[in-house]
Amino acid sequence: MKKSSLLYKIINGIWDMCYIWKTEMRNVFRDEGVLIFCILVPLGYPLLYSWIYNNEVVREVDTAIVDLSHSHSSREFIRDYDASPDAKATYYCNSLDEAKELVRRQAVHGILYFPADFDTKLNRGEQAHVGVYCDMSLMLTYKAIYQTSQAVASHINSGIQITQAGGFTDRDDEITTEPLAFDEVPIFNTTGGYGNAILPAVLVLILQQTMLLGIGMAAGTSRELNRNRELIPVSEHYGGIFRIVFGKALVYFMVYAVMGMYLTLVVPKLFSFVSMVTWTTILGFLLPYILSCVFFGLMLSCLVRYRENVMLLVVFTSVPLLFMTGVSWPLSNIPGFWQGFSWVFPSTFGIRGFLRISSMGDSLSDILPEFRALWIQTGVYFLATCLVFRQQLRSARLKADLTAEVAEEEDEAEEIVDS
């Protein structure tokens, strides 16, 4: 077969791509750092994170009580508060400073404060206040204390309304306290817990972040092992852009196709999270998401000079990226600039799409904006990766030529000296 024929070039390109794939795959399993980020972390970290929040809600949160009123009304409030499943009146303090000290020592996670005029204002028909102080270092305890206080206050308010209304029948009392009856039925997050709300987003983010860490660490290793500190080695197999890009991308796509199915199908089932995912939908959704993450990581790998650099580039972005998706913070309250900035990352559309698939049972046709955005990112980052690797290949060849010229000059100088 002639070397100039198209068929020969195609076969040779496929052969070189397979060689690059084999080399990169071998490096993934031989490099302990890459193996940890690409295999062990995606396997183990979701289990640990899901196990920690598997209870969904916290119960019997310790609370300090500062009752300066010492009245029947304040004791009724405290009794109802303590009877709730989510909170518990643990300590009774004589002052607010004493209660703050308990919070500082983490003996309690919140304070209920009743001023001295609490019962007096209620008897006068005036508005009375109950101070609720919460430790916001953990949102679950804050939620338990705050919502329990609100529920007890609403219950006591209903009793005050009934007394002041002076109704004659139970129906009059119902209309007074609840003129519009409604039933609160959670549709998607049926448990109302932290796990079902946040963990699906975290699982998708783990795919992107561990992939970026693994690709970046592998790139740093390649530079450190290269004599010229270049990302791409000078070899006959690394003679074309597409064979390099496809060979490297195929490695991470194969690894993370398995990890993606594990994170989106196996982990939610293990911990009984709400999951309405179907095989066909998640396969179609993971294809553009994983591809966009792979090409995004390969594009950024040119910035990594040393293995440790990738930790500085990737790790600190996890929490901001989660916020910018609109999962843990309302999207309407995120400034337009940061919303636009979040579109750079595949995790933004990946998390939004997966949450709708998992919690609402949406199909691909229902999440077309996110699905199209992921394919657009795949195309854009693929082209950007090709441009970056083209520049890296040119730089590697140039430095190799310069090194060869210097070596030849040194050999000639040695021959002249010897003669």
Language-model-derived ranges and their functions:
Residues 73-77, 148, 215, 295, ...:
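Hydrophobic alpha-helical segments typical of transmembrane helices
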Residues 28-35, 206, 247-253, 257, ...:
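Loop-to-transmembrane-helix entry motif
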Residues 44-47, 185-268:
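Hydrophobic alpha-helical transmembrane segments of multi-pass membrane transport proteins
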Residues 14, 18-22, 196, 237-238, ...:
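Alpha-helical membrane-protein architecture signal
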Residues 37-38, 200, 246-247, 310-313, ...:
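Hydrophobic core positions of alpha-helical segments in small-molecule transporters
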Residues 1-196, 391, 397-419:
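Extracytoplasmic/periplasmic domains immediately adjacent to an N-terminal transmembrane anchor
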Residues 48-49, 91, 101, 254, ...:
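Membrane-spanning alpha-helical segments of multipass transporters and channels
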